[in-house]
């Protein structure tokens, strides 16, 4: 599962670098496609190499991938926070979506969705210390379930 998640994250990263649709701003320091609010159409899915991909980046995708792609994700985090700052970062963290191809002032969806904010917090902590994964894996119910499924240490 870890390797599959890493591969999926790297697909997003490489897609943004290749940028086949020529969207402004996408690249090594701006990638991450998933369901989120969108400055053009409201809440929708953004998937690489589909009609739904319109240049909108969902910060949660790259930020939440930090355990799988630490260098690539940290590049996005630094770019969003230090270079774009208040354009993409608000009181509760990164806004839900950003599309650099749009007119300034219309590029950012200034919403905070729990389904997008929550994974960022948890995965940053897992990257930092492994805390949440470690607590989860020590729960007796989880150990029992894994044992019943044939998993061994």
Task: Indicate where each model-derived feature is located.
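Ser/Thr/Asn(+Pro)-rich, low-complexity disordered segments
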Residues: 1-153
């Amino acid at each position: 599962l870890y390797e599959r998640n890493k591969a999926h994250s790297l697909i997003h990263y490489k897609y943004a670098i290749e940028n086949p649709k020529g969207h402004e701003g996408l690249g090594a320091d701006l990638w991450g496609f998933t369901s989120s609010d969108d400055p053009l159409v409201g809440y929708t899915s953004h998937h690489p190499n589909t009609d739904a991909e319109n240049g909108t980046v969902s910060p949660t995708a790259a930020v939440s991938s930090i355990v799988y792609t630490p260098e690539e994700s940290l590049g996005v985090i630094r770019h969003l926070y230090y270079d774009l700052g208040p354009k993409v970062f608000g009181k509760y963290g990164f806004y839900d979506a950003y599309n650099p191809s749009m007119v300034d002032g219309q590029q950012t969806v200034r919403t905070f969705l729990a389904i997008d904010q929550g994974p960022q917090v948890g995965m940053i902590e897992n990257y930092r210390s492994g805390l949440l994964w470690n607590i989860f894996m020590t729960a007796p119910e989880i150990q029992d379930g894994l044992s019943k499924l044939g998993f061994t240490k």
